[in-house]
Amino acid sequence: INHGETIWRTFESQVRETVGLSEDETRIYSKTMNDSIVCFATQGNTPKKLWASNVGFGYEHAPSMPQEKEGVMYGSTKEGLIFALNAQTGEVIWKHKIGNSLINTVVPLNKKEVLFTATSGEVGLLRMK
């Protein structure tokens, strides 16, 4: 796209600036302002919602972007929660609370390891079993 025009827009989900792109660039993920992650197809001239997942994080406005690695979509919240979803279905794989401070955009290294930083100063590596 070289023209800068809006291809499609939807008001179906109440999202903010938290948009992430899948590794294969066929899906976009966004955190809603209340509890959920939504996933839309990138192809086409009309919005096509693929799934929505209620992660249960409550009211949310942190600008951390969803990230995908090896079929897992990772996200974080203003309340110290990091979570992982199946990128194809939106099924919650796990949730882990780091603390009570905002977690910045996480950096998944692979399917089992995620780097994170928090606004309270923590820097860490989560390893899943």
Question: Which role does the model predict for each range below?
Answer:
Residues 5-11, 45-57, 92-98:
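Aromatic (tryptophan-biased) beta-strands that constitute blades/sheets of beta-rich domains
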Residues 87-108:
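Short cationic/low-complexity microdomains
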Residues 56, 81-82, 87, 97:
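C-terminal soluble interaction/assembly domains
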Residues 10-38, 57-82, 102-124, 128:
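Repeat-blade elements of multi-bladed beta-propeller folds
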